[in-house]
Amino acid sequence: MRLSFGKQRYHGGTTVTLTEQGASDSLRAAQAIFQNHSNEVSSPCPPVTVSRNPQTRLSEPSLQKSGRKQEQKKARIRTKQVPKIKTTAPNDVELSKKHRSSPAGKDNVSSTAQMAAALAHSQSKLSSDNNSSHSSALDTLKVLETPNLNGLLGIHSRSSSRNGSNESLTPGQRTPDNRSQENLLTSFSSGRRLSSSSMEPATNKDSNKALPKRRPSPPLQSSLVGSGQLHENENLSSISIDSRHSLNPDTSDVISNRSQTSLSQTINQLSLCESEPSIASSNTTTTTSNQGSGLPNLVPNYSSDMRKKKLVNKFKRKVFGSKPKHLSSQYEMDASSEELGQHEQQPSMRFKTTLRKTSVSTNAENDHASSLHEGNLRYKYNPSNDTYDVYDDTDSDSESDQNQDALTKPRKRDRIKRKIRNSANKTAHHRPIHRTRDRKFNEDKPWKSHTDITFVTDNERKRYESMWVSNRHRHLNLLSWWPSITGDSGAINTLPEDGLILGIIVRDIWKRSNLPNSLLAEIYTKVDTRKDGTLDRKSFIVGMWLVDQCLYGRKLPNVVEQCVWDSVDRYASTTVVPVSTLKAMAKQKRKQMKEEIKNIKKENRVVLVDHNSSS
């Protein structure tokens, strides 16, 4: 009778059909595996079997007699070439003729497949009685199903689902062993697909009646199992399947024993997980919080938000200066964890000590000083006494500090600068003795730009002449002696060429100096040479110069010197002696006069002594 096997692969919850080359390779691997199991008649059937065709049944003695030695040799040779591919073999699928074995070994391939199928069917029938006792234990495991159960039994359930052949059987042909394996499969698939209602039809009524009603799993169960854990389970399941179906006949018993011990260890771990629900709940909350926001913030002092706050506060200190003293409080604001969503004020532990070591210290101070090297302390600058306050910072992992910029220890350079700025003696800045720039003329204080000289300078003469030109020949007809238009014009010919200025206009100009009228009248009498109520050019310029000298603070001289009158019509080429030089010269003159007086007194004294001695 001819058997046809269609090779498929179970991956990611779906069954994928293999290629022709992969199907031929997997068929060879299955033949070698069944040949190894046929040699072990006394050993129990492995928990994972391939699909069986009930139509091909041969007796066990006939299978053992037909070419056992030849198949063992062929299996040993094929183990080096067969890849480890996990397959299933449903019925009614035939492989293509291109990838089948050679014509010489065609009969061997078909006979080996028939032998393997018959052997698997017979051994499953014999082990059904033994596995009925284990089905009750597996049913109780399903009652105790928890989120931790899915993670613990995921390896066994996936290995049985990927290598088992229950998918090719009908619900009536499934054994209790297969049902127990399906219970484990549904416990794991319920965590991944969030429902297990579509896994088993209503044919298993007897087994469902024996099971008590259990509490449904939470809907967020799948989120507790990370993607990394699922990949690990897949890798472990593939490793266990490959090791379980290894082609070495000497290690088959050891592998079967390991599978039984792993199941017992799983049951023990399940009991431990059920006895400690509080620990499991706390672990689930931490995993969900970490899964939603990535890695946990193990060092909150160096998070991105705190670095931004630190830079902002540093910029504010540079622009607005340091914080005032009344803003530094004795207690700090501490934020609680984000899980509770509450903000509380807790007084943090703070020690009012400095980094200066004293000769006499208590045990508490020694412990506090030793903790400086452990890195559990923070520093805060105290501007009142130019020190750094130290306080404990053991709870920095769970609390976020708002004033992080003030809690870090300043650099050595900043501390030295602060000490120099506070301790250095500030010297007052003195103005230089020598004049660094030219002073401008101050109209409100004209005496500050005046030098004591005895003649009219060129700048002063130009300023006075401009006023003379703008005010001469005005209102002269008001004078009594000024000739009329119809009168004699002989008097006009005797007037000076530069012209004249009316005395009333001169008085109005000089009054702007705010000098007293008596002083102005005295100046006018000293410069008036015409005695007819008018002033000529020389008299007006000299009078203006005397007014300025009075404004500079000099006393009005009794008689105007001739050098002043001469400087009006000439350009003075003499150098101006500075005031300091004039003062030094005057001091030297006084000193010489004192020396002269002393010498005169000595001579008089000598004369008196000689006169007395002679007498």
From Swiss-Prot:
Q: How does it assemble?
A: Interacts with INP51.
Q: Does the keyword Nucleotidyltransferase apply?
A: no
| Homology family | Belongs to the IRS4 family.
Q: Name one GO cellular component term.
A: plasma membrane
UniProt-recorded name of the protein? Increased rDNA silencing protein 4
CDD domains in the record: EH
- SUPFAM superfamilies with a match to the protein in the record: EF-hand (SSF47473)
Basic and acidic residues compositional bias, start-end: 365-377
Span list, region Disordered: 38-135, 152-260, 277-304, 323-445
Please report the stretch or stretches of sequence annotated as the EH domain. 460-571
